[in-house]
């Protein structure tokens, strides 16, 4: 009984294994039959034609040009690089043409996925004239397909990644707009043999999810043209991309920091004219910081002789900072030049008048004018600056009632005292003039910078922006 059960179990297992094997063999056979059917359809067509020449375009026997209709779907697009003058684009590229030699009686279109089989058919040798590099996608299978319709229409679809050359006009950078084109033409067939046309009313479609960090795709223009070469005239199709540069990044990274640096340089106008270390260090620091900022802005640009909008901005900001340094130099020179002729401390004229008044009071108290005040020790015109300053700071000069100040009887002549006071007044007058220059600078520098901003932004955003750059292919 047990042996019978064991035999039945073994027999059942063998049937399952054999049945599964037959199933997989059947599935492989079906797949192979389907592939053979597709290949047989194409080879049968080629055999029926007999002398099919894959190197001859379809209408060669009629001496007519073959029309190739093209269209594309832009899957992705990267930034437009100003330094390398190119951009990357990922597209699905479709071509359609009619080859009457491939007409067949099938009710449905024939799908061709084998690159070798597609190589047996004639197809246009289109290429992208201004592409630096181009590559097909092969993951997980070669990304292409071919449909052959009963009337001989051939539809070819593939996915291509391109690095496209774009000669940009950077005169308005970074407030610029660019026109970059993608030019398509045949390599071997001229206009008498092959004519390229855009297919349908909207042959260039764009993935709406495309986002570029520094550019905005405004619109796409497409047209056909005739290119003249020494060997003849070639038909070509052009897709022209109009892009605007995003300015937000440049405002945050360049325009706002440099504007703040210029404003900081104006702080020196509120410092005292004799605060030399503070004003010099402030001017030099702002100038060096602005130079560093300008160098960083130029690193993303090619070395070109054209004057760009960012160059105008950086140069003007540097001129404002340098002008602030010159203003301080002029003011400080005026003050110091007068000090060298007769250095007097601030309020020195008032001190002289006080000394004269005190002297007259003391003089009335002395009988017969035994001792009289002499200014000459403290106000000698030929003494150096440091000595004059120290003499006026001495206690003996400030306290006129001490006997040590009365060194001789003779009074200082009125004419000499007048000369000293005139010199002191001129020092004070020049100091006030220097302060007046600072006050004017506090208003004129910001006003000039505001006027520059108005003209700068109006010109580059409105006037210069109305002239779109010409497409260079």
Swiss-Prot record:
Keywords: Cell membrane, Chloride, Chloride channel, Disulfide bond, Glycoprotein, Ion channel, Ion transport, Ligand-gated ion channel, Membrane, Postsynaptic cell membrane, Receptor, Signal, Synapse, Transmembrane, Transmembrane helix, Transport. This is Glycine receptor subunit beta-type 4. The lineage of its organism: Eukaryota, Metazoa, Ecdysozoa, Nematoda, Chromadorea. Glycine receptors are ligand-gated chloride channels. Channel opening is triggered by extracellular glycine. Contributes to the generation of inhibitory postsynaptic currents. The chain crosses the membrane at residues 250-271, 277-297, 309-329, 440-460. The keyword Ion transport applies. Residues 20-249, 298-308, 461-473 are extracellular. It holds the Pfam family Neur_chan_memb. Disulfide bonds join 166-180. PROSITE patterns: NEUROTR_ION_CHANNEL (PS00236). SUPFAM superfamilies: Neurotransmitter-gated ion-channel transmembrane pore, Nicotinic receptor ligand binding domain-like. GO terms for cellular component: chloride channel complex; postsynaptic membrane. GO terms for molecular function: chloride channel activity; extracellular ligand-gated monoatomic ion channel activity; transmembrane signaling receptor activity. The keyword Membrane applies. Pentamer.
């Amino acid at each position: 009984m047990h042996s019978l059960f064991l035999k039945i179990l073994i027999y059942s297992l063998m049937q399952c294994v054999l049945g599964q094997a037959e199933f997989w063999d059947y599935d492989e056979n079906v797949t192979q039959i389907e592939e053979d059917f597709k290949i047989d359809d194409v080879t049968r067509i080629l055999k029926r034609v007999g002398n099919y020449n894959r190197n001859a375009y379809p209408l060669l026997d009629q001496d007519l040009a073959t029309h190739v209709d093209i269209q594309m779907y832009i899957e992705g697009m990267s930034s437009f690089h100003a330094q390398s003058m190119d951009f990357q684009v990922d597209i699905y590229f479709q071509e359609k043409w009619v080859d009457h030699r491939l007409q067949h009686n099938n009710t449905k279109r024939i799908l061709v996925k084998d690159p070798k089989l597609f190589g047996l058919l004639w197809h246009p040798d289109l290429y992208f004239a201004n592409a630096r590099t181009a590559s097909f996608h092969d993951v997980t299978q070669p990304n292409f397909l071919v449909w052959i319709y009963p009337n001989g229409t051939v539809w070819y679809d593939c996915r291509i990644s391109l690095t496209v050359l774009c000669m940009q006009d950077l005169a308005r950078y970074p407030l610029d707009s660019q026109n970059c084109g993608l030019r398509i033409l045949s390599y071997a067939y001229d206009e008498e043999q092959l004519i390229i046309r855009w297919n349908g009313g909207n042959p260039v479609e764009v993935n709406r999810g495309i986002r570029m960090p520094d550019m905005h795709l405004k619109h796409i223009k497409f047209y056909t043209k005739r290119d003249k070469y020494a060997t003849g005239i070639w038909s070509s199709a052009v897709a022209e991309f109009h892009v605007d540069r995003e300015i937000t990044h440049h405002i945050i990274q360049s325009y706002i920091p440099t504007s703040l640096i210029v404003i900081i340089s104006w702080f020196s106008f509120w410092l005292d004219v004799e605060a030399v270390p503070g004003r010099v260090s402030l001017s030099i620091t702002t100038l060096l910081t602005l130079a560093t900022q300008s160098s960083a802005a130029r690193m993303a640009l090619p070395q070109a002789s054209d004057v760009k909008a960012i160059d105008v901005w950086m140069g003007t900001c540097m001129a404002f900072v340098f002008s602030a340094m010159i203003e301080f130099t002029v003011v400080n020179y005026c003050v110091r030049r007068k000090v060298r002729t007769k250095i007097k401390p601030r309020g020195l004229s008032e001190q002289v008048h006080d000394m004269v008044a005190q002297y007259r009071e003391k003089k009335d108290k002395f009988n017969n004018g035994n001792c009289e005040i002499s200014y000459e020790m403290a106000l000698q015109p030929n003494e150096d600056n440091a000595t004059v300053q120290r003499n006026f700071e001495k206690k003996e000069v400030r306290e006129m009632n001490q006997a040590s100040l009365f060194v001789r009887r003779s009074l200082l002549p009125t004419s000499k005292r007048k000369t000293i006071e005139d010199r002191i007044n001129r020092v004070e007058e020049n100091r006030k003039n220097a302060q007046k220059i600072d006050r004017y600078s506090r208003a004129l520098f910001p006003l000039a910078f505001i006027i520059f901003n108005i003209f700068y932004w109006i010109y580059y955003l409105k006037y210069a922006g109305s002239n779109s750059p010409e497409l260079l292919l």
